[in-house]
Amino acid sequence: MTNIRKSHPLIKIVNDAFIDLPAPSNISSWWNFGSLLGVCLIVQILTGLFLAMHYTSDTATAFNSVTHICRDVNYGWLLRYLHANGASMFFICLYLHIGRGLYYGSYTYTETWNVGVILLFAVMATAFMGYVLPWGQMSFWGATVITNLLFAIPYIGTELVQWIWGGLSVDKATLT
């Protein structure tokens, strides 16, 4: 008698991918965080797209758009909370993924590690823009702190802040 998980065509695909996966026996749960990063990224993109459908750049109506999403949009409250908490979960998985790389000495593969560092900077820049740009004045503090950090870069700091924000003070909605 054959086992159904090895003979049925559809169940065999799931069996080969999850149960009888040809992977080394020394892989621990630390190796799951790369996959979790992908899941978190997909959730962030999808919820961000749906939230952007109700985006308002006017500072007078920005907070009203948030309440509109939570009250009037079907499962809008869930979209908002998934997007906010998904960002936190994304960065938790990201830092655990980096920690796993440090623990197992992956920094010795310099090309791969440098690509990871570039991706980390790109993720942080994207998260900053996603945090600062929408909904007007909700993130003055974050924009001010990061603007001051950019200003501290030698030689190019002043020009960089002028180019990004137009000056040291952040005012009104930045997406108009």
Curated annotation (Swiss-Prot):
Lipid biosynthesis in keyword set: no
A Pfam family that the UniProt record links to this protein: Cytochrome_B
GO MF, any single term: metal ion binding
Cellular component GO terms held in the UniProt record: mitochondrial inner membrane
Record's cofactor remark: Binds 2 heme b groups non-covalently.
Topology class, membrane: Multi-pass membrane protein
Binding site for heme b b566: 97
Cofactor(s), names only, from the UniProt record: heme b
Alphabetic keyword roster: Electron transport, Heme, Iron, Membrane, Metal-binding, Mitochondrion, Mitochondrion inner membrane, Respiratory chain, Transmembrane, Transmembrane helix, Transport, Ubiquinone
Residues involved in heme b b562 binding: 83
Domain of life of the native organism: Eukaryota
Cell compartment(s), UniProt: Mitochondrion inner membrane
One GO biological process term: mitochondrial electron transport, ubiquinol to cytochrome c
RNA-binding is among the record's keywords: no
Transmembrane spans: 33-53, 77-98, 113-133
Family, similarity comment: Belongs to the cytochrome b family.
Subunit and interaction comment: The cytochrome bc1 complex contains 11 subunits: 3 respiratory subunits (MT-CYB, CYC1 and UQCRFS1), 2 core proteins (UQCRC1 and UQCRC2) and 6 low-molecular weight proteins (UQCRH/QCR6, UQCRB/QCR7, UQCRQ/QCR8, UQCR10/QCR9, UQCR11/QCR10 and a cleavage product of UQCRFS1). This cytochrome bc1 complex then forms a dimer.
Function: Component of the ubiquinol-cytochrome c reductase complex (complex III or cytochrome b-c1 complex) that is part of the mitochondrial respiratory chain. The b-c1 complex mediates electron transfer from ubiquinol to cytochrome c. Contributes to the generation of a proton gradient across the mitochondrial membrane that is then used for ATP synthesis.
Misc. comment: Heme 1 (or BL or b562) is low-potential and absorbs at about 562 nm, and heme 2 (or BH or b566) is high-potential and absorbs at about 566 nm.
Protein name: Cytochrome b
Gene giving rise to this polypeptide: MT-CYB
